[in-house]
């Protein structure tokens, strides 16, 4: 079973979301997602300043197996991207919940968080796959 940190929120598309002290949210892909994709070779990051809607594809993770869209779990403005992934995309594999984060978003409608999964619900989703 994959590591599913209890303090995070999750999407059904295998993104995770962590609220930061400044009110923004850090987004990445889950350990389960990176295990399915395999070794990362490139991450196409979104543009800082871009406005996205929940469910929009806004980044791409390319691995030795496949290219997979990464979706915005909430609507808002992209306020930062993880530039370290340009040189070290493997951080998504080795540290999916830490150094392998993908972007930070300032949510425009925090009520959208209610549609995300908590750790227990995400674990149940994984068991059903």
UniProtKB/Swiss-Prot annotation:
SUPFAM superfamilies per UniProt: Single hybrid motif (SSF51230)
Any one cellular-component term (Gene Ontology): cytosol
The protein's assembly and partners: The glycine cleavage system is composed of four proteins: P, T, L and H.
Cofactor remark: Binds 1 lipoyl cofactor covalently.
HAMAP family in the record: GcvH
Reported function: The glycine cleavage system catalyzes the degradation of glycine. The H protein shuttles the methylamine group of glycine from the P protein to the T protein.
Name used for this protein in its record: Glycine cleavage system H protein
Family to which this protein belongs: Belongs to the GcvH family.
Alphabetized InterPro entries for the sequence: 2-oxoA_DH_lipoyl-BS, Biotin_lipoyl, GCV_H, GCV_H/Fam206, GCV_H_sub, Single_hybrid_motif
Gene Ontology BP annotations: glycine decarboxylation via glycine cleavage system
Lineage of producing organism: Bacteria, Pseudomonadati, Pseudomonadota, Gammaproteobacteria, Enterobacterales
UniProt domain Lipoyl-binding: residue ranges: 24-106
Keywords: Lipoyl
Cofactor(s), names only, from the UniProt record: (R)-lipoate
Gene3D superfamilies: 2.40.50.100
N6-lipoyllysine carried by residues: 65
